[in-house]
Design a protein with these regions (language model features):
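N-terminal cap/lid segment of alpha/beta-hydrolase-fold proteins
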Residues: 11-54
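Short, surface-exposed "cap/lid" segments of acyl-processing enzymes
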Residues: 53-104
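Catalytic nucleophile loop
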Residues: 66-67, 87, 96-98, 140-153, ...
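Alpha/beta-hydrolase active-site loop
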Residues: 113-132
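Alpha/beta-hydrolase-fold enzymes
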Residues: 133, 137, 141-142, 146-233
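The feature captures the conserved acid-bearing segment of alpha/beta-hydrolase catalytic domains
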Residues: 237-244
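Short beta-strand/loop motif that positions the catalytic acidic residue
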Residues: 245, 251-253
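Conserved alpha/beta-hydrolase "acid-adjacent" motif
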Residues: 258-263
Length: 263
């Protein structure tokens, strides 16, 4: 069904924008408009996967967060391949959000200024609340690359916690790697100056992935790695806040991952 259908939620406006059968899987795509951030134009697309022949027999909810320059297709290809499809076929209730301006999530008005801080403070709590409402269960969260970093920020900033998170799995993400050139203030300042002249960085042009990234995320990352930088925002130190988080955690890294290498 291609037309926009109303979906029931007591949290904020939600529309079911498509409901399709994809082989042995069901694919429902929701558009969330939480209205909880300073930019009221933010809308988030969330894809729900399940077994087509048993639509009412939903299992344990799992939320999959994609990385930078990516979208839902990292987890679930058009041919039904990927971890999202794998988990759905094994009875899990799979939810795949797409970050602002990625995939089916349209660009918000302040797209260029989007930051991990915004995703962590506003978007992930709204997504988590919607999944809990629809599934009546506490979801497990899996994050890859920037998705995992955003999830860690939400936990360290106390925006997500045990009442909303059954467990966390982080794949190929880190914030502790040193980028020594960024410790030299003129280098960091020069990088920021160049980036501020842009709205986004093209994933296709730089062969990073199918999506663009807002320049705000890159400037924020440079600040984390600057001379006096920290993993946090002006209000909270997310790194220190992680010490107070009490949820089951699985962290996976690989020696062959040169961008987010194994310790």
């Amino acid at each position: 069904c291609k037309s926009i259908m109303q979906s029931s939620s007591n949290l904020f406006p939600v529309a079911l924008i498509s409901a399709e059968r994809r082989g042995d899987l069901s694919e429902d795509v929701y558009r969330l408009k939480p209205g909880n951030s300073p930019d009221g134009t933010v809308e988030l697309a969330v894809t729900r996967l399940g077994l087509a022949d048993v639509p009412e027999n939903r299992g344990t909810p799992v939320i999959l967060l994609h990385g930078s320059f990516s979208n839902r297709r990292f987890w679930y290809s058009p041919k039904g391949i990927g971890l999202g499809a794998y988990l759905a076929r094994r009875g899990f209730d799979v939810w795949i959000p797409e970050m602002r301006g990625h995939g089916l999530s349209k660009r918000n008005q302040a797209y260029a200024r989007n930051r991990v801080a915004d995703y962590a403070r506003y978007d992930l709590p709204a997504i988590g609340a919607f999944v809990r409402e629809q599934s009546a269960q506490i979801p497990h969260w899996i994050g890859h690359s920037l998705g995992g970093t955003t999830l860690a920020a939400a936990l360290g900033g106390q925006y997500l916690g045990a009442p909303a998170v059954a467990s966390v799995a982080l794949f190929g993400c880190q914030v502790s790697r040193n980028y020594w050139p960024l410790k030299i203030p003129p280098v960091e300042w020069g990088g920021r100056f160049i980036l501020k002249r842009m709205a986004e960085v093209s994933g296709a042009r730089f062969k990073r992935g199918p999506e663009d990234e807002p320049v705000g995320v890159l400037i924020e990352t440079m600040r984390w790695h600057g001379l006096f930088g920290r993993f946090g925002d002006t209000e909270r130190d997310w790194w220190k806040g992680l010490a107070d988080v009490d949820v089951p955690l699985l962290a996976v890294s690989a020696a062959g991952d040169h961008q987010d290498p194994d310790w």
